[in-house]
Amino acid sequence: VRFDGLKMAVLVTSGLALGGDHIDQLIFKRFVSPHLGKGERWVRRVDGAVIETEFPFDEFEALLLNWPVTYTLNQGKYRSKIRDGIQQGGAAAEKFQRLEELISHNLSYRVFQAIRSAKAALSTTAETIIDVPELDLSIALGLPEFDDLLQDLLAQIETLIDQTLARAGLNQSDVDLVIRTGGSSLIASIRLCLEARFPGRVVVHDPFTSVAAGLSIASYYGHEYDPATTIER
């Protein structure tokens, strides 16, 4: 955005269709799913023969990640596979039992609450815990592991910044101010990415309400938007 007195020109708009929920799902898949049976062996008897394969966790994971529909995993075609996993015993049985309890008590949303709390904690500390006592689940999560999880996302952000500046006809040095907004802007690696590219020019103010508040302030002071200057994504 370029300001000239009370007039503002949006030079270019662009963005990634990835938000905090996407990051929460990445955390679930990498750090939580292995504690629910992902990657374990599945032993069952079919027509008198003992068959062993990898447990088909992919059938469960999509519904676990979309917590409003996790209850649909209560169907027999899913529960029977979990029962096989529990009955086979061994170290994996505890994980399958945990998966059974998550589904029976519809605890996916509770797991995501714990993930969001841990993610927020990593904005200010180097290590935290994904803690879900209802499932006897406590997973240590450190900043290095979290940063590694975000590498693809950070690369996309870097590319998007380059593309946005190019389309606006600007260099990094032409940018006077970068405003961090939204919960994901509090993530340490994203903050450091922006500060490395725009040193001394990155600010944050009320990341969860700044967009709505900014529009209200702009309206109060009579700022005018000229849509003719905008380059769409």
Positions of predicted regions on the chain:
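Phosphate-binding glycine-rich/basic clefts of nucleotide- and phosphate-handling proteins
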Residues: 2-134, 227
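Amphipathic alpha-helical transducer elements in NTP-driven molecular machines
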Residues: 20-25, 93, 108-112, 143, ...
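Adenine-nucleotide phosphate-binding core of ATP-dependent small-molecule kinases
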Residues: 100-108, 135-164, 168
